């Protein structure tokens, strides 16, 4: 210092010391300010601190700040996440009093019955969403966007589809392109003999349910109109110069036979095979890893089978799906799944969804629901044929919607009874107060959706077998429930077509509207003369719908049926998926009927999905 003083005059030395002191004071104040407003990282994004609070925080004593920082970051790491966030700074004059708002736990007494824990922020009280969700029947979840959490709340869980206006009998059926009937857990499998779903909804034994079969057909019909054409890989046509097919790679073990032969009935060559059941069978390498809809033309001369080997996601294990010439529904043993496809002693086409067949087999159970499974096929490895018979046109494709549609249409033609209906061969108990429906009952919803399916099959093929079947299907509409029909009369005035023809009548809304859509499809397709009866039934039904629609409006949602009126019990409120079905149906009807009531109800019922309610007095 003496050396420095000797070399620098006192005025310069004083300036240097003053600058040094000023820098020290500024740095000291900055450190104090930073610590005073320090908050846990996971809470800092939620704090809103205004300029006055920041200023108060900067003036907090350093000892107190150090104590708080040390306590929050070191002493209680678990509590740090649970503690309510503190909003605002500290007031030095108030003995450490927190400025602004803070969360604090508060008891919440619910309806004078029980207490739950909530949180209070000033005058605002927050209840746990786990309680809110159940109490108000609402929905919410935490989702991530760009690394940040966000809570999304919704009043309902079901969506309304945009109506393709106007509706036509040869077009997409409502929003059925989004239906996947075969993957439902109440579908036991797709029958190998019939090619349609077998339901277990009301009985684990399985039964054919006309509504489900019609929906299966209508969904695939609609998908065919809305999806791009499928990719098809041809593996065998038995033609030597077929440029579209893959190179033939058949393996014929000793004792087996395979050859291309002419089939005069088909005017083409086919593959003849002879392979004893005890042999490995003749096999064709496939190796497809993209598509899983297999199709082949088949004719057996003896008992036999066609099997498909699949490499799966289950540790790359091989599973084999066997299509056997018997009537067994489905069986599963170890890694082998069996579907009976019937004798097949005349030429027929077998089309199977290997994904569905694999998963239904692995998930097979003795209960009403198929067991959930994650297994999926990764590769279609090879096809194996045993017995004596013929094969042709072996393909694998992305989809085969029209095959599924015509399987449903053909089933409806084959299984319609002499009264024009499709009897449902399972007992149905709708609820307390209603008599059980014994096996053999008809459903107006089944009749309507079957008609919609058959009309489309007729419009595609111009085959009158489909139109005639649809025309006969109007007969149950004319008979009362107690006469083994589907008609009910509300207040001795309004004709109604019952989804469930119960005693007393139930007046289910969605099933009634489906029955009307079927009648509309038929009257528009059959013409003035043939469609006369369908037109009369449709017009009477539409009059009833317009008169009775207000009975299904609760002011905040819709009602499934009128059991509260018929039985004098609590109303049967429609779940949100049924509520949106009501809206989708009314949207469709609004494109074929100009009555303003349909658009008015659509608008109001849509608003209920967002929490709107009718005005009170």
Swiss-Prot record:
Residues assigned to the Cytoplasmic compartment are 1-11
Q: Which UniProt keywords apply?
A: Calcium, Golgi apparatus, Isomerase, Membrane, Metal-binding, Signal-anchor, Transmembrane, Transmembrane helix
- Any one Gene Ontology molecular-function term assigned to this protein's record: calcium ion binding
Binding locations of substrate: 179, 184-186, 201, 209, 212, 215, 429-432, 499-500, 510, 514, 560, 563, 572-581
**What InterPro entries does the entry give?**
C5-epim_C (IPR010598), C5-epimerase (IPR039721)
**What residues does Ca(2+) bind to?**
237, 239, 268-269, 392
The UniProt entry lists membrane topology as: Single-pass type II membrane protein
Q: What ranges are annotated Lumenal (topological domains)?
A: 29-617
Can you list the GO cellular component terms from the UniProt entry?
A: Golgi apparatus; Golgi membrane
Could you tell me what this protein does?
Converts D-glucuronic acid residues adjacent to N-sulfate sugar residues to L-iduronic acid residues, both in maturing heparan sulfate (HS) and heparin chains. This is important for further modifications that determine the specificity of interactions between these glycosaminoglycans and proteins.
The UniProt similarity line reads: Belongs to the D-glucuronyl C5-epimerase family.
Subunit field text: Homodimer. Interacts with HS2ST1.
Entry protein name: D-glucuronyl C5-epimerase
Name of the coding gene: GLCE
């Amino acid at each position: 210092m003496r050396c420095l003083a000797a070399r620098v005059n006192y005025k310069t030395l004083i300036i240097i010391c003053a600058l040094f002191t000023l820098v020290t004071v500024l740095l000291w104040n900055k450190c104090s300010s930073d610590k005073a407003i320090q908050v846990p990282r996971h809470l800092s994004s939620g704090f809103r601190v205004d300029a006055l609070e920041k200023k108060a925080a900067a003036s907090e004593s350093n000892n107190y700040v150090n104590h708080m920082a040390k306590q929050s970051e070191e002493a209680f790491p678990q509590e740090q996440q649970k503690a309510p966030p503190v909003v605002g700074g500290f007031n030095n004059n108030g003995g450490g009093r927190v400025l602004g708002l803070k969360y604090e736990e508060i008891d919440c007494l619910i309806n004078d019955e029980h207490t739950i824990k909530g949180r209070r922020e000033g005058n605002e009280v927050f209840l746990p969403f786990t309680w809110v969700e159940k109490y108000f029947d609402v929905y919410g979840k935490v989702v991530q966007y760009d690394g940040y959490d966000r809570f999304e709340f919704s009043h309902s869980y079901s969506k309304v589809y945009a109506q393709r206006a106007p509706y036509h009998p040869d077009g997409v059926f409502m929003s059925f392109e989004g239906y996947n009937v075969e993957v439902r857990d109440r579908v036991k499998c797709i029958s190998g003999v019939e090619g349609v779903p077998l339901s277990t909804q009301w009985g684990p034994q399985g039964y054919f349910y006309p509504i489900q079969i019609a929906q299966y057909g209508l969904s695939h019909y609609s998908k065919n109109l809305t999806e791009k054409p499928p990719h098809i890989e041809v593996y065998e046509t038995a033609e030597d110069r077929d440029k579209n097919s893959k190179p033939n790679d058949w393996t014929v073990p000793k004792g087996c036979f395979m050859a291309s032969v002419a089939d005069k009935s088909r005017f083409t060559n086919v593959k003849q095979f002879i392979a004893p059941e005890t042999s490995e069978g003749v096999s064709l390498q496939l190796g497809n890893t993209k598509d899983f809809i297999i199709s082949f033309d088949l004719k057996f001369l003896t008992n036999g089978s066609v099997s498909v080997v699949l490499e799966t996601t289950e540790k790359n294990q091989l599973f084999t799906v066997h299509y056997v010439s018997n009537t067994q529904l489905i069986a599963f043993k170890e890694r082998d799944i069996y579907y009976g496809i019937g004798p097949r002693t005349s030429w027929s086409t077998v089309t199977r969804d290997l994904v569905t067949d694999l998963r239904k087999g692995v998930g097979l159970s003795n209960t009403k629901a198929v067991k959930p499974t994650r297994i999926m096929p990764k590769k279609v490895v090879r096809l194996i044929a045993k017995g004596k018979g013929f094969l042709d046109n072996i393909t694998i494709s992305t989809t085969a919607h029209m095959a599924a549609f015509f399987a449903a249409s053909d089933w409806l033609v084959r299984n319609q009874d002499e009264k024009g209906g499709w009897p449902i061969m399972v007992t149905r108990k709708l609820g307390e107060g209603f008599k059980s429906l014994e096996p053999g009952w008809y459903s107006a919803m089944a009749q309507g959706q079957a008609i919609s399916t058959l009309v489309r099959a007729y419009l595609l093929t111009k085959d009158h077998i489909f139109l005639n079947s649809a025309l006969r299907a109007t007969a149950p509409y004319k008979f009362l429930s107690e006469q083994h029909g589907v008609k009910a009369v509300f207040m001795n005035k309004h004709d109604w077509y019952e989804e469930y023809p119960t005693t007393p009548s139930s007046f289910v809304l969605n099933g009634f509207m489906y029955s009307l859509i079927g009648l509309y499809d038929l009257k528009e397709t059959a013409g003035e003369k043939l469609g006369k009866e369908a037109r009369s039934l449709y017009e009477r039904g539409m009059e009833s719908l317009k008169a009775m629609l207000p009975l299904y409006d609760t002011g905040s949602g819709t009602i499934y049926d009128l059991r509260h009126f018929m039985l004098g019990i609590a109303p049967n409120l429609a779940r949100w998926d049924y509520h949106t079905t009501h809206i989708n149906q009314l949207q469709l009807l609004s494109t074929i009927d100009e009555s303003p009531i349909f658009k008015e109800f659509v608008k109001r019922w849509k608003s209920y999905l967002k929490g709107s309610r009718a005005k009170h007095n």
